[in-house]
């Protein structure tokens, strides 16, 4: 079967002139193309649609197709728009994933430093430092497995540390081996309030807020790591505690961006812009939204993205605690 692009004009071709390029479509794709055509996608039988399906599975496209079918641009659903939406989602995830990494790095540094200073390098093996025995046992099992896996892969520093400590991994090394999920479990279960409050204060929040936000960031991170569909979900993977002073819905997928900007904001007056992570993220996300406003601005509300005139939420989340306080009319007090 040959589908000729000359059968129609691409919506991106402003001249209206058809292309002479033809695509040979494998028979195994006929059923999918016919199914999409039956669902009302105007460009379903075009060669570009089969080309896309050879590079992105139908299952992966489904959430984007469903969103475009429910809310077609210009009144007509197109596979091309689903592809554009998927690309927009991937770009958002790539930006968010980068800042998840920065948040993770600070979380690891803060927790390991405070636990080591207060309780020594082998503190994670001390049952008395944790609130719930069962949770500690599960966390320690995960931690030990992750450290041993790193040693088996040939990391000499981890191998040496295990040998010197009877098979136990000091937290200053082990913290870099553990998953964010394991770190989240350990932090939430840590009994020493000086440690947990100190870590939370470094992010400008309370222990209960940080424990909640850690779960949400971890769940979102797992989606980003595999480029699963994200912004087109009906709600965020796990609903976090709301950020005080931020009016956006904490159930919508986009809330993860506000959460990360809030966590990475800072009270301190820093001259080095490369360290102003929240403002950098705000700039990147704002740029992405502005570039795609013409295509998908009408869907932003579905995703929980503030309207252009309501983006103060993003500025407040990203601007740092001092900036937020100034915006509230009290320059001498941070939140």
Regions found by a protein language model. Name each.
Residues 1-219, 231-335:
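Extended intrinsically disordered or low-complexity regions, especially N/C-terminal cytosolic tails and loops
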Residues 227:
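Acidic/aromatic/glycine-rich contiguous surface patches that form carbohydrate-binding/processing clefts
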């Amino acid at each position: 079967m040959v589908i000729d692009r000359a059968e129609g004009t691409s919506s991106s071709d402003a001249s209206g002139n058809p292309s002479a390029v033809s695509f040979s479509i494998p028979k195994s794709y006929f059923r999918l193309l016919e199914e999409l055509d039956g669902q009302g996608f105007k460009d379903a039988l075009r060669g570009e649609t089969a080309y896309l399906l050879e590079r992105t599975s139908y299952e992966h496209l489904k959430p984007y197709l469903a969103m475009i079918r429910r809310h077609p641009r210009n009144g007509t659903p197109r596979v091309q728009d689903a592809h554009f939406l998927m690309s927009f989602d991937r770009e958002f995830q790539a930006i968010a994933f980068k800042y998840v990494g920065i948040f993770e790095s600070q979380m690891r540094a803060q927790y390991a430093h405070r636990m080591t200073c207060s309780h020594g390098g082998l503190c994670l093996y001390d049952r008395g430092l944790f609130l719930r025995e069962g949770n500690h046992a599960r966390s320690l099992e995960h931690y030990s497995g992750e450290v041993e896996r790193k040693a088996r892969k040939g990391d000499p520093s981890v191998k040496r540390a295990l040998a010197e400590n009877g098979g136990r991994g000091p937290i200053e090394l082990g913290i870099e081996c553990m998953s964010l999920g394991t770190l989240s479990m350990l932090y939430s279960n840590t009994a020493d309030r000086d440690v947990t409050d100190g870590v939370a204060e470094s992010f400008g929040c309370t222990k209960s807020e940080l424990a909640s936000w850690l779960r949400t960031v971890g769940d979102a991170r797992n989606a980003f790591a595999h480029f699963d569909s994200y912004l087109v979900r009906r709600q965020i993977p796990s609903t976090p505690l709301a950020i005080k002073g931020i009016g956006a819905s904490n159930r919508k997928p986009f809330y993860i961006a506000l959460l990360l900007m809030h966590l990475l904001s800072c009270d301190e007056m820093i001259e080095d812009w490369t360290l102003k992570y929240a403002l950098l993220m705000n700039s990147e996300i704002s740029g992405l939204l502005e570039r795609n406003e013409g295509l998908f601005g009408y869907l932003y509300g579905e995703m929980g993205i503030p309207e252009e005139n309501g983006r103060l939420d993003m500025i407040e989340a990203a601007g740092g605690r001092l900036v937020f306080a100034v915006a509230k009319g009290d320059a001498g007090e941070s939140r």
